[in-house]
């Protein structure tokens, strides 16, 4: 018995197979081609959407976008690896018509078209709406940290330089010390030469590291990412309104949109502005812990607020009146009478100060409404909707949650390509390749 034998490398064929014979009818490449060929590249902002009349011909941006979508769908993000795929991968040969762009052309396309790629992703969301995969009734918002290109040492050194310059500015204003102009000039030059000035230290599962905060808004029907944004904010408490507005725009501005998020998005002012625009936020209020007497004294929740009189009632039925408005903290401070507190038998359980003080957020009513809507069912919907896409983006599409491009613009381009790849995967899993291809045609 012999082994199964392959054909001789010198064997000629009377009817040579075409590239199309190597790509099945239900292959993802055919979906990518149907989607990209339907795009108005010029309208989306892609350069060289129409060939120039003079000069050396360039690559069609459609071909390079197809290449990147294929790469992100197969965990190939590097421009050099994509260049290699063009020469050895039959599927890529079919997709690009045997074109073999060099890695510089591939990398330059991604670097230059961050905004255009984001608009192309919005077109895919619009197509998903047309085929019924986006309902626009409930949207879950979430954020996750992705490592930046810069090392921790580089970002730490940059922060040290900034602190040094701040100290020099303070010393200059006070005229206390003699400042070396050459040292300041060297520090400024080093700061200006930083290749990734936007990266910030953020807390991640592996500790603090230079990172960006990736925000997504996911439709609850089938898990389509309808909006995304890359920010330099280490926390999420200022992202509720911008992400909710972005989701509403992507859904063609419905009259009412339910948005669910975790306690990290707790922001009374933004919740109120959401309600003014027909956006109904559902998120737990992220109140500070009770640190009165190491947690042994009366918590703020035991004090009852009267909206008509704008006062609080303490557990001893005494009144706390408005004292002042702290605009920079967006809070109102209330204080009990020192005379009432001095005679109160509950004072040892209430405060160690002369009198008890309380703070109330200026937009506390909106915060309370948002908190009341954050039911167990709504929080379960949030977990099931927004957590899975991040897992797929980080470990299936990216491979590891670290960017290849420096800067906020580069990170946005990568996330836009990754979310397009994720949405294509989701649409194919729901509709199937054949039906999706027909819908996109």
Segment roles from a protein language model:
Residues 1-19:
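Short, flexible loop/hinge motifs at secondary-structure junctions
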Residues 3, 50-55, 374-377:
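A ubiquitous short alpha-helical element
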Residues 5-6, 68, 75-88, 97-441:
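Anion-binding and metal-coordination hotspots
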Residues 13, 64-65, 122:
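A generic alpha-helix surface/boundary motif
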Residues 22:
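C-terminal catalytic core of Y-nucleophile DNA break-rejoin enzymes
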Residues 25-69, 74, 362:
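Basic, short loop/linker segments at the boundary and entry of helix-turn-helix/winged-helix-like folds
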């Amino acid at each position: 018995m012999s082994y199964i034998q392959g054909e001789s490398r010198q064997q000629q064929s009377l009817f040579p197979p075409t590239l199309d014979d190597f790509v099945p009818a239900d292959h993802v490449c055919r979906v990518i081609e149907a989607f990209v060929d339907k795009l108005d590249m010029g309208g989306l902002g892609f350069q060289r959407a129409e060939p120039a009349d003079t000069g050396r011909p360039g690559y069609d941006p459609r071909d390079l976008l197809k290449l990147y979508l294929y790469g992100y769908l197969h965990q190939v993000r590097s421009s050099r690896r994509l260049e290699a795929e063009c020469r050895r991968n039959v599927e890529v040969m079919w997709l690009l018509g045997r074109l073999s762009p060099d890695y510089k052309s591939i990398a330059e396309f991604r670097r230059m078209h961050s905004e255009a790629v984001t608009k192309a992703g919005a077109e895919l969301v619009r197509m998903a709406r047309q085929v019924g995969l986006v309902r626009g009734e409930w949207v879950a918002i979430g954020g996750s940290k992705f490592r930046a290109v810069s090392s921790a040492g580089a970002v730490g050194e940059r922060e040290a330089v900034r602190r040094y310059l701040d100290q020099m500015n303070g010393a200059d204003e006070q005229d206390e010390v003699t400042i070396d102009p050459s040292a300041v000039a060297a520090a400024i030059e080093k700061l200006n030469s930083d290749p990734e000035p936007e990266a910030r230290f953020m807390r991640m599962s592996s500790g603090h590291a230079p990172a960006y905060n990736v925000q997504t808004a996911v439709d609850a029907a089938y898990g389509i990412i309808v909006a995304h944004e890359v920010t330099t904010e280490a926390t999420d408490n200022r992202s509720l309104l911008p992400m909710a507005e972005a989701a509403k725009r992507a859904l063609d501005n419905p009259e009412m949109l339910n948005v669910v998020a975790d306690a990290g998005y707790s922001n009374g002012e933004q919740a109120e502005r959401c309600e003014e625009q027909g956006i109904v936020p559902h998120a737990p209020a992220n109140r500070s812990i009770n640190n009165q007497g190491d947690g042994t004294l009366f918590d703020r929740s035991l004090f009852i607020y009267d909206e008509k009189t704008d006062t609080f009632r303490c557990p001893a039925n005494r009144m706390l009146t408005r004292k002042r408005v702290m605009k920079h903290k967006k809070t109102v401070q209330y204080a009990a009478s020192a005379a009432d507190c001095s005679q109160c038998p509950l004072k040892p359980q209430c405060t160690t100060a002369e009198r008890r003080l309380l703070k109330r957020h200026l937009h506390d009513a909106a915060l309370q409404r948002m908190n009341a809507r954050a039911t167990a069912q709504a929080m379960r919907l949030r977990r099931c909707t927004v957590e899975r896409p991040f897992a797929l983006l980080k470990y299936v599409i990216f491979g590891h949650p670290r960017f290849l491009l420096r800067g906020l613009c580069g990170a946005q381009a990568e996330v836009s390509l990754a979310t397009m790849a994720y949405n294509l995967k989701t649409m194919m899993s729901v509709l199937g390749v054949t039906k999706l291809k027909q819908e996109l045609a």
